[in-house]
Amino acid sequence: MEEEGVKMDVKLLNVSDQEMEEMRRNVFLTTLEQLKAWARSNSLWPLTFGLACCAIEMMGVGSSHYDLDRFGSFFRTSPRQSDVMIVSGTVTKKMAPIVRRLYDQMPEPKWVIAMGSCATAGGPYVKSYCVVKGVDQIVPVDVYIPGCPPNPAALIYGINKLKEKIRYEAKTGKKVL
């Protein structure tokens, strides 16, 4: 098996060449961190935090047509049971401390998806005195999904990108910004 340019060869006693070839095809070697990341990436539990129009599109992802459950994601209503916060809609300065409190109540590891133009950059209300110019000013964001509003397929794509990010960070040990 080759990993990062290093060839790993296992020498076993009393094993025939045929058995060794069978083991190479059927034995999977990994690290515990990669195994945990694989499990976490395939069982994301998003906290629904709908603030505006994008929330309606987010609800569509849970319907039978898109069926987010088939990807191992189940919407949770409590931050203590969630590991992904999906912020969909305009975040006002009055709502900002509540968003931060919900984020702080989530257990580690935790991730944030900013869904829609309003959550990512303030949207059409960006010049208003009471609108936060992107949820990344309150909590760290892992995935941005553009659109006004983004369709459910875009949210599924964003969730899949988050899964890839989780696995990549565990494999390389590098934080992806």
From Swiss-Prot:
Under Gene Ontology molecular function, one entry of this record is: NADH:ubiquinone reductase (non-electrogenic) activity
Membrane topology of the entry:
Peripheral membrane protein
* A single Gene Ontology CC term: respiratory chain complex I
Q: Which UniProt keywords apply?
A: 4Fe-4S, Cell membrane, Iron, Iron-sulfur, Membrane, Metal-binding, NAD, Quinone, Translocase, Transport
What Pfam families is this protein classified in?
Answer: Oxidored_q6
What are the EC numbers? 7.1.1.-
Question: Which reactions are catalysed by this chain?
Answer: a quinone + NADH + 5 H(+)(in) = a quinol + NAD(+) + 4 H(+)(out)
Q: Could you state one GO biological process linked to this protein? A: aerobic respiration
State how the cofactor is bound.
Binds 1 [4Fe-4S] cluster.
Domain of life from the UniProt record: Bacteria
Where does this protein reside within or beyond the cell?
Answer: Cell membrane
- Which residues span the membrane? none
- Give the family from UniProt: Belongs to the complex I 20 kDa subunit family.
Among NCBIfam families, the record links this protein to: nuoB_fam, PRK06411.1
Q: What does this protein do?
A: NDH-1 shuttles electrons from NADH, via FMN and iron-sulfur (Fe-S) centers, to quinones in the respiratory chain. The immediate electron acceptor for the enzyme in this species is believed to be a menaquinone. Couples the redox reaction to proton translocation (for every two electrons transferred, four hydrogen ions are translocated across the cytoplasmic membrane), and thus conserves the redox energy in a proton gradient.
Quaternary structure annotation from Swiss-Prot or TrEMBL? NDH-1 is composed of 14 different subunits. Subunits NuoB, C, D, E, F, and G constitute the peripheral sector of the complex.
User: What is the name listed in the Swiss-Prot or TrEMBL entry for this protein?
Assistant: NADH-quinone oxidoreductase subunit B
Q: From which lineage does this chain's organism come?
A: Bacteria, Bacillati, Bacillota, Bacilli, Bacillales
